A protein has these predicted regions:
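Residue-level signal for inorganic ion chemistry
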Residues: 28, 73, 137, 168, ...
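Short, flexible turn/loop "capping" segments at secondary-structure junctions
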Residues: 10-11, 213-216, 244-249, 315-317, ...
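Conserved C-terminal structural/oligomerization subdomain of aldehyde/semialdehyde dehydrogenase
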Residues: 24, 223, 311, 318-488
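Residues at or immediately preceding the N-termini of alpha-helices
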Residues: 3-6, 25, 43, 230, ...
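Rossmann-like NAD(P) dinucleotide-binding subdomain of oxidoreductase/dehydrogenase enzymes
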Residues: 92-232, 348, 472, 476
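ALDH superfamily catalytic-core signature
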Residues: 2, 163, 196-328, 391, ...
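N-terminal Rossmann-like NAD(P)+-binding subdomain of aldehyde/semialdehyde dehydrogenases
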Residues: 1-101, 275-278, 472-488
């Protein structure tokens, strides 16, 4: 679809989107429910498509794609009506000198949302963003990834079987479609992908002054504290390194542990590695990015513990999960995005050191903390420069349908998922109704403007002076000014 064809499509969508936005939220949510049920009915087709596209096994297709998308739909069914309802401003929050005013804040659809999709979780991540945009009343133009063609086809089919025509359009998955979409007359962009692509899109959006949500890469850390369960933390790190063959934005890349636990942690990781069968990764270019970073780290002093030789890392499209120890936070492998199963082990002496190591990375998507103390875990979590933290688990908690998902730094901005993700698809519209005819501020545009100075000054002192004496003085000045004005 070229620029002209897309422009014509958007003109038609504008009309349909306006009608869709006016539809009762309950009617929109009935369609979400139908879509959720279709996910269940077509689960085997979806799983087969995911396997065809990326080699994702059936259990992972169910647990990491279909189930979390269904849960995200159910969250909207239960909560969207409340979240999108107009919010009345309480009388107690209204300044008393605005006593004649009553205000409401409405949530309006942004209009047409352009979604540039990803390939690593093509059903879950794309599905959540599309459904949230539609529930908020938007039209959606979706540019799917060229690396998940079969899954894209089924997702589009289920959307079109559920929602009205002309509020959802799927573009070609070719790379050329992305710039065409961003240059078109859309109102908001949601993009999941690399830092480089995110920067290019941010620049394009800035030129048109349209907002965006960017969910970019991560180099997530797992912090094992002194009182944490070593076996559980090591198992979590291994799981979070290898899920989806390491092709997960919130995969654990840095395992930050007390230096006294290095031997115990390494032993556990090697035990897990020896019984693990590596999976084929989808994009060989990801191996091309990871291997030089591994080489550079080893030259700078890191030690490869698994696999036993460097030549065993990448064979026949299979990337064996790497375990590197003696890694330091300034190494490239801790600062450049990797989309392959590589786990770097870093050691620390104090908790402050651990926090410093985690925050040294320019990416800030997610993090995990393992500790026996919930209080300590939350205290450390609040110091981490990331968008989400899980305590005593990894990856899975971030898929909770009621929580926002998004990063800071080079991991992007904005949020998808949960309340924040839904509201991100809207803009606030405040409406204030003023009764009566008392409008003293109109005098500011008349020759009597200076007469209001004592009244406004008295009001300011009466309400905001730092001392009781000052506030009493303000009330006196206000009453005196009002009396003098009445006499005149």
């Amino acid at each position: 679809m070229n620029n002209q064809e897309l422009a014509e499509k958007l003109l038609l969508m504008r009309t349909s989107q306006g009608q869709w936005e006016k539809l009762l939220i309950q009617d929109k949510l009935q369609k979400v429910r139908k879509f959720r049920h279709l996910l269940v009915e077509h689960r085997q087709r979806i799983a087969q498509a995911l396997f065809f596209d990326s080699g994702k096994p059936y259990e992972e297709a169910l647990g990491a794609e279909i189930l979390p998308l269904a849960e995200a739909c159910k969250f909207l069914e239960k909560n969207a009506a409340h979240l999108l309802r107009p919010r009345k401003i309480r009388s107690s929050d209204t300044p008393w000198w605005m006593f004649l005013q009553k205000s409401k804040v409405h949530r309006k659809a942004r209009g047409i949302v352009g979604i540039i999709g990803t390939w690593n979780y093509p059903l879950f991540l794309n599905g959540v963003q599309i459904i949230q945009a539609l529930v908020a009343g938007n039209g959606v133009v979706w540019k799917p990834s060229e690396n998940a063609l079969e899954t894209n086809k089924i997702l589009a089919e289920l959307i079109l079987a559920t929602f009205p025509p002309n509020i959802f359009t799927e573009l070609s998955s070719s790379r050329e479609s992305g710039p065409v979409l961003v240059d078109s007359n859309i109102d908001f962009v949601v993009m999941t992908g690399s830092v480089e692509t995110g920067k290019a899109i941010a620049k394009k959006c800035a030129e048109r002054l349209i907002p965006s949500t960017l969910e970019l890469s991560g180099i997530d850390s797992l912090l094992l504290l002194e009182d944490g369960d070593v076996d559980l933390a090591a198992s979590a790190a291994w799981f979070a390194t290898n899920i989806n063959a390491g092709q997960t934005c919130m995969a654990i890349r840095r395992f930050v542990i007390p230096e006294t636990m290095l031997e115990k942690v390494t032993t556990k990781l090697l035990e897990l590695a020896k019984n693990f069968k590596p999976r084929k990764i989808l994009m060989e270019s990801q191996a091309d990015c990871a291997l030089p970073l591994i080489d550079a780290a080893m030259i700078e002093g890191a030690e490869l513990k698994w696999p036993l030789t460097k030549s065993d890392i990448w064979k026949d499209g299979h990337f064996d999960a790497c375990i590197l120890i003696n890694v330091r936070k300034e190494m490239g492998i801790c600062n450049e995005a990797i989309f392959a199963p590589v786990l770097s082990v870093l050691t620390y002496k104090t908790i402050d050191d651990a926090i410093c190591i985690s925050n040294a990375c320019p990416f800030g998507l997610c993090a995990s903390i393992f500790t026996a103390s919930q209080e300590l875990g939350e205290k450390v979590a609040l110091e981490l420069k990331v968008g989400s933290v899980s305590i005593n688990d990894a990856i899975v908690p971030h898929a909770h349908p009621a929580t926002p998902f998004g990063g800071v730094g080079l991991s992007g901005w904005g949020a998808t998922q949960g309340e924040e993700g839904l509201l991100e698809m809207t803009r606030p519209l405040s409406i204030s109704i003023v009764s009566g005819k008392f409008r003293p501020h109109y005098e500011l545009a008349t020759p009597k403007a200076a007469d209001s100075i004592p009244i406004v000054e008295g009001l300011l002192l009466a309400l905001h002076a730092p001392t009781w004496f000052g506030r009493i003085k303000g009330w006196f000045k206000l009453l005196l000014s009002g009396f003098q004005k009445k006499q005149s």
